[in-house]
C-alpha cells in the first residue's frame, strides 16, 4: 500500500534490525501510519513521502566499520523530528558531528537507564533521578555528543544512553523501546509521534482499508486477478479486500494439495460459496503435490517445491479462465521478515515461506499482496472491519505449505493421514477444554522417529507425535502454552488409542526465539 496520499506518515529507515517491523507496529498502535524503507533508498522515499517524523532503526553493523550504513543527510536537514534507536542513535551521533566507538562493555538483554535530566521524550513517564528497565543489544557506545545535543540518561556502560537536541526535536536512545522487554517503550514512542512530532494519531484499520482498496485498484486496473484461497484468516481477508476493490475481476482458487487438515477443503468451499458469494474454484492437485514431495527431507526444498507447484496450478487455472494478470496472496509481515528483509535491507534470512521466498523467479502473473505490511492481529482487525465473524477471525494460523512442514523428513500419504488424524484429535481436545481462544496456534507434528511401545500384550514400533501450542500477539515472538499436565495426558492418551501408527506423544516447550513456531 502506498502512503503518498497519507498526510501524517512516519518514515522508518531500516538498518537491518530484526525488530524494525516492531517499531512500525508500535507506531501503528499509536494510530499513526508508518512506512519502512531500507537505508539505501531512504532519500528517495523521504522525498516521495514527505514524512512528519523519521525513526532510524537498530542494526547489526558498527559505525566503526568501513562502509557501515548511514542515513541520508536530508533526514537531518529537513527540520522534521528524528529518533535514533540503538544503531540509529550511533549513526545520528556520527553524522551530526559526535563520536562513537566499539566498546568492550557490551549490553545485551535487560538493562537499566538512569534519568539525569527531564526530556519531552519521556514526559509523564520518567523523571530525573529515576532508574528504569529497558532492553539493549549493542556493542558500540557514544563517547562525545554532537554540537547542540545534551545527555538525558545513562546506563552502566554508556554515559550517553539517551541524548537529544530539544530545539531540533532530535533524540537518540541506546535501548529498544519497540520490544516488550522495555516496559515503557510503547508509551515512549507515543510521546515521540504525538507530543514531539505533533501527529494526532487518526490512522485506523478503516483508513488502511480505504488506502488498500485504492492501491489495489491502481495496481490491477482492468486486469483479472486470481486469489490463492486457503480458508485461513489471511487469504480470506485478502480475498474480501480485493473483491471490494475490483469485484468480478477476481476469481478465488482453493488448491487442495493433499496437505490440508481434516475435512478442511469441503468446509472452506461451503463457507465461501454460501456466505460470501465469492467466485471460487476447487482444484484437486493432491497427486501432483504429494508425488513431487514424496521422499524430500530438506525443509527449504519442500517450501520451494510447494511454491513452484502452486504457481503451476494457478497458471493452468488462469488459462482455463481465459488468462489472468495477477496472483493475489495473503502474505503478512512475519512471512516476509522470516524469508528476507521486508525492505530489501541487510536483515538475516531465517527461512523461506512458500508464498515469499518459495516463489519461482519467473512467473506469468504479477503479485498482489495487500496484507504484506500487516501483522496478524492487524489482519484480524481488518477482517472484523470487513465483516468477518469473530468465530472465523479467531482461527489459529495455518501455513500455506500445510502439513508438509509439520511432517519433518520424507512425506508419504500414510504419514499425512496419521498426522491429519492426530491433529484433529488434538484441536478437538483443545476446544472441549475451552482453551482454543487462549492459544495463538496449536498443532501436531509427526516426527521421523519411531520408538518401541507396548500396546495390549504386543510390542509396537511406531511414530512419535509432538504437540505444539504457543501464545503470541503478532507471530514475531512466542512462548509455549503452559498446559495443565492432566490435559496433556488426556490428549496423548486419546491420540495413541485412536490413531494407528503413533505410540508416543511429546510436548514442545520451545519459545520463539530461539525456535520458530513451525518446525520447518
UniProtKB/Swiss-Prot annotation:
Keywords attached to this entry: ATP-binding, Glutamine amidotransferase, GMP biosynthesis, Ligase, Nucleotide-binding, Purine biosynthesis
Annotated catalysed reactions: XMP + L-glutamine + ATP + H2O = GMP + L-glutamate + AMP + diphosphate + 2 H(+)
UniProt KW ATP-binding keyword: yes
GO molecular function per UniProt: ATP binding; GMP synthase activity
CDD domains: GATase1_GMP_Synthase, GMP_synthase_C
Catalytic residues (positions): 86, 176, 178
Chain residues that bind ATP: 230-236
Residues covered by the GMPS ATP-PPase domain: 203-395
Database matches in PROSITE patterns: GATASE_TYPE_1 (PS51273), GMPS_ATP_PPASE (PS51553)
EC number per UniProt: 6.3.5.2
One Pfam family here: GMP_synt_C
Taxonomy, superkingdom: Bacteria
UniProt cross-references to InterPro entries, sorted A to Z: Class_I_gatase-like, GATASE, GMP_synth_C, GMP_synth_GATase, GMP_synthase, GMPS_ATP_PPase_dom, Rossmann-like_a/b/a_fold
Domain Glutamine amidotransferase type-1 residues, every copy: 9-202
ATP-binding as UniProt keyword: yes
This protein's pathway: Purine metabolism; GMP biosynthesis; GMP from XMP (L-Gln route): step 1/1
GO cellular component: cytosol
Listed PANTHER family: GMP SYNTHASE [GLUTAMINE-HYDROLYZING], GMP SYNTHASE-RELATED
General function of this protein: Catalyzes the synthesis of GMP from XMP.
Quaternary structure note: Homodimer.
UniProt-recorded name of the protein: GMP synthase [glutamine-hydrolyzing]
Gene behind this protein: guaA
Amino acid at each position: 500500500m502506498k502512503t503518498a496520499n497519507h498526510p501524517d506518515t512516519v518514515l522508518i529507515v531500516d538498518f537491518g534490525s530484526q525488530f524494525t517491523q516492531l517499531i512500525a507496529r508500535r507506531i501503528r498502535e499509536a494510530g499513526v501510519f508508518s512506512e519502512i524503507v531500507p537505508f539505501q533508498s531512504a532519500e528517495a522515499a523521504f522525498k516521495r513521502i514527505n514524512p512528519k517524523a523519521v525513526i532510524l532503526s537498530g542494526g547489526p553493523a558498527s559505525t566503526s566499520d568501513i562502509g557501515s550504513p548511514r542515513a541520508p543527510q536530508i533526514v537531518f536537514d529537513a527540520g522534521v523530528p528524528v529518533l535514533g534507536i540503538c544503531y540509529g542513535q550511533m549513526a545520528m551521533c556520527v553524522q551530526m558531528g559526535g563520536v562513537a566507538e566499539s566498546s568492550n562493555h557490551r549490553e545485551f538483554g535487560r538493562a537499566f537507564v538512569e534519568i539525569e535530566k527531564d526530556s519531552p521524550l519521556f514526559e509523564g513517564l520518567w523523571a530525573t533521578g529515576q532508574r528504569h528497565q529497558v532492553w539493549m543489544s549493542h556493542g558500540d557506545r557514544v563517547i562525545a555528543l554532537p554540537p547542540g545535543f545534551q545527555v538525558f540518561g545513562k546506563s552502566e556502560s554508556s554515559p550517553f544512553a539517551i541524548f537529544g537536541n530539544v530545539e531540533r526535536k532530535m533524540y537518540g536512545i541506546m535501548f529498544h523501546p519497540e520490544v516488550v522487554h522495555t516496559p515503557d517503550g510503547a508509551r515512549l514512542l507515543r510521546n515521540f509521534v504525538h507530543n514531539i512530532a505533533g501527529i494526532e494519531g487518526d490512522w485506523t484499520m478503516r483508513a488502511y482499508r480505504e488506502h488498500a482498496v485504492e492501491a489495489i485498484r491502481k495496481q490491477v486496473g482492468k486486469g483479472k486477478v486470481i486469489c490463492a484461497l486457503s480458508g485461513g484468516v489471511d487469504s480470506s481477508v485478502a480475498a474480501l479486500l480485493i473483491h471490494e476493490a475490483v469485484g468480478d475481476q477476481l476469481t478465488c482458487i482453493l488448491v487442495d494439495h493433499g496437505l490440508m487438515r481434516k475435512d478442511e477443503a469441503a468446509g472452506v468451499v461451503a463457507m465461501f460459496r454460501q456466505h460470501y458469494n465469492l467466485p471460487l474454484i476447487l482444484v484437486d492437485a493432491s497427486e501432483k503435490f504429494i508425488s513431487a514431495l514424496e521422499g524430500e527431507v530438506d525443509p527449504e526444498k519442500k517450501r520451494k517445491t510447494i511454491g513452484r507447484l502452486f504457481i503451476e496450478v494457478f497458471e493452468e487455472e488462469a488459462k482455463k479462465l481465459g488468462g489472468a494478470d495477477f496472483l493475489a496472496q495473503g502474505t503478512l509481515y512475519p512471512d516476509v521478515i522470516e524469508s528476507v528483509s521486508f525492505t530489501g535491507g541487510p536483515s538475516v534470512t531465517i527461512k523461506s515461506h512458500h508464498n515469499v521466498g518459495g516463489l519461482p523467479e519467473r512467473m506469468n502473473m504479477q503479485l498482489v499482496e495487500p496484507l504484506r505490511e500487516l501483522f496478524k492481529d492487524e489482519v484480524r482487525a481488518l477482517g472484523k472491519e470487513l465483516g468477518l465473524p469473530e468465530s472465523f477471525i479467531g482461527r489459529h494460523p495455518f501455513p500455506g505449505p500445510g502439513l508438509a512442514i509439520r511432517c519433518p523428513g520424507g512425506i508419504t500419504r500414510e504419514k499425512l493421514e496419521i498426522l491429519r488424524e492426530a491433529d484433529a484429535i488434538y484441536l478437538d481436545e483443545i476446544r472441549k477444554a475451552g482453551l482454543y481462544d487462549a492459544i495463538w496456534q496449536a498443532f501436531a507434528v509427526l516426527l521421523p522417529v519411531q520408538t518401541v511401545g507396548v500396546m495390549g500384550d504386543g510390542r509396537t514400533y511406531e511414530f512419535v507425535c509432538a504437540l505444539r501450542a504457543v501464545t503470541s500477539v503478532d507471530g514475531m515472538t512466542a512462548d509455549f502454552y503452559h498446559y495443565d499436565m492432566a490435559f496433556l495426558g488426556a490428549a496423548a492418551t486419546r491420540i495413541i488409542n485412536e490413531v494407528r501408527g503413533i505410540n508416543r506423544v511429546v510436548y514442545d516447550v520451545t519459545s520463539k526465539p530461539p525456535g520458530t513456531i513451525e518446525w520447518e
